[in-house]
Structure formats: C-alpha cells, structure tokens
Amino acid sequence: MCYAKYGDRLFKELHELEDMPTAIFVANDSMAAGCYKAAYEIGLKIPEDISIIGFNDIPTAKYMIPPLTTVKVQMEYMGEYAVHMLEERLNEERELCMKVTLPARLHIRDSVKELKQRT
C-alpha cells in the first residue's frame, strides 16, 4: 500500500472519532495527499474545517490545492549522519546510541489556519 492510501485511511478513521482533531501532522507529504483526498470525499474543506501539515516538502507540496504546509529536513544531512553512524557501528567504535538533531524548516502555506473551538 502506498503512503497516500495510508493517509486516506488514517483520515477516514480520524473522521469517525467522536472528537475529531482540528489539525493533523502526518509522517510525510504523500500521506498528506491521501488526507486531502479523504477530506474532499467526506466534504471537509482544508483549512476551513481541518488543518493538515506534512513532512519532507516534496516538490509537488506547493502545487497541492491548497498548498501544503510542511516541514523540510535536509535529507543530505540525514543520509550523511546515517552512513557515519552505520560505519561506527560496523567498526565497533560506538556501542551507545547517539541522539542526532537535524536542521528543519517549517514552510507555512495555505493548508493550516487557526480554527474556532468546536462545540
């Protein structure tokens, strides 16, 4: 199953909740696309009824309707750190886990807005 289908299914499950959230932060932009599809099928408008935020800023995120708010992580840094950590583990230079913080940037577009409290 592709990520968009997971987003579609996740959104529909959330919609069935008695107290559906007003915002969803999904694991990646492809899942966000699935959430967009589900929202459309259910009849909810983004961002008027629900805010959606993605992760990884795929090139098409800014062309979605409305443009997707997303978090961009420098993937080259992530890959570089992953290779370095793998080399350390393979060479038995590191036994303990290491916490890595990567630079990220929030790209605020039109898929989020402050919603009034639901009654």
PLM segments and residue spans:
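Flexible loop/turn connectors
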Residues: Y6, L10-R118
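Short beta->alpha junction loops
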Residues: M1-K5
